[in-house]
């Protein structure tokens, strides 16, 4: 017989319940299987807040322990085994041994000392269950109060876990959106870079054309100025000749 995984919660020795789980007893009740629910398009409401079961502290300790810490059941070689939580009172040495075993398991399973660590949480939960078991045996009322504290802690952790998963999903969506936006911006930058190079090429072409036009106009202006200067000189010489001829004609009459 191989018992289930070892736990810090103290259990009694396993008890064989059924030697053949495949053989159906005529008095056994069939298992109730819930029919699959119709898929609804409406959003599913959040699960209700878990409540600690109402237990009567006057009941026997074993009954209370089985209610707050259910027995472990497993099947091996078609045999059903059950292992209930121990109802043996604990001593001071048991508490010391529990602390030593907790430290040993934390070290063996390489639990992280800080931050979120599922291994550390599991071991401390087992240790807390064992403390609840020890307290419940001595004082049922105190044990039930610790049970409420445990359930409240579990509910708070579950709420934080849901919030964390939601935050991670939101962060991933934002990261994907940012990555998509980054790709779009990179494509836009590449297009603008190509457009810039094309505009620079056009500017260089226009500059070259402008320089050619300026050079051609400068040459043409020089030719025109030279031509005008020659015409002025020609007109001046002609004027001097005409003036001299006119003076030669007028002078003898005096």
UniProtKB/Swiss-Prot annotation:
One of its GO terms (molecular function) is dynein heavy chain binding. InterPro entries: Axonemal_dynein_light_chain. One of its GO terms (biological process) is sperm flagellum assembly. Its main location: other. Residues 175-245 form a coiled coil. One of its GO terms (cellular component) is dynein axonemal particle. It holds the Pfam family Ax_dynein_light. Keywords: Cell projection, Cilium, Coiled coil, Cytoplasm, Dynein, Flagellum, Motor protein. The keyword Cytoplasm applies. Signal peptide: none annotated. The keyword RNA-binding does not apply. It is found in: Cell projection, Cilium; Cell projection, Cilium, Flagellum; Dynein axonemal particle; Cytoplasm. Residues 1-55 are annotated as: Disordered. Belongs to the inner dynein arm light chain family. Involved in sperm flagellum assembly. This is Axonemal dynein light intermediate polypeptide 1. It comes from Xenopus laevis (African clawed frog). The gene is dnali1.
């Amino acid at each position: 017989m191989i018992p289930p995984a070892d736990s810090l919660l103290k259990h009694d020795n396993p008890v064989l319940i059924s030697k053949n789980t495949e053989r159906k007893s005529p008095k056994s009740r069939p298992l109730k299987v819930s029919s699959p629910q119709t898929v609804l398009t409406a959003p599913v409401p959040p699960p209700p807040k878990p409540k600690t079961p109402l237990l009567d502290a006057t009941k026997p300790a074993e009954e209370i322990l089985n209610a707050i810490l259910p027995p472990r059941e497993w099947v091996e070689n078609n045999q059903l085994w059950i292992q209930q939580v121990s109802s043996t009172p604990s001593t001071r040495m048991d508490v010391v041994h529990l602390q030593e075993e907790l430290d040993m398991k934390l070290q063996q399973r390489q639990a992280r000392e800080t931050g979120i660590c599922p291994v550390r949480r599991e071991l401390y939960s087992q240790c807390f269950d064992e403390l609840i078991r020890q307290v419940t045996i001595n004082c049922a009322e105190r044990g039930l109060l610790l049970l409420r504290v445990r359930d409240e802690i579990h509910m708070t952790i579950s709420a934080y876990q849901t919030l964390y998963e939601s935050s991670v999903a939101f962060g991933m969506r934002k990261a994907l959106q940012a990555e998509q936006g980054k790709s779009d911006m990179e494509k836009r930058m590449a297009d603008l870079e190509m457009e810039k190079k094309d505009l620079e090429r056009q500017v260089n072409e226009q500059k070259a054309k402008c320089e050619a036009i300026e050079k051609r106009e400068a040459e043409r202006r020089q030719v025109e100025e030279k031509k005008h200067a020659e015409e002025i000189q020609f007109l001046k010489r002609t004027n001097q000749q005409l003036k001299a001829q006119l003076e030669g004609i007028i002078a003898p009459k005096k």
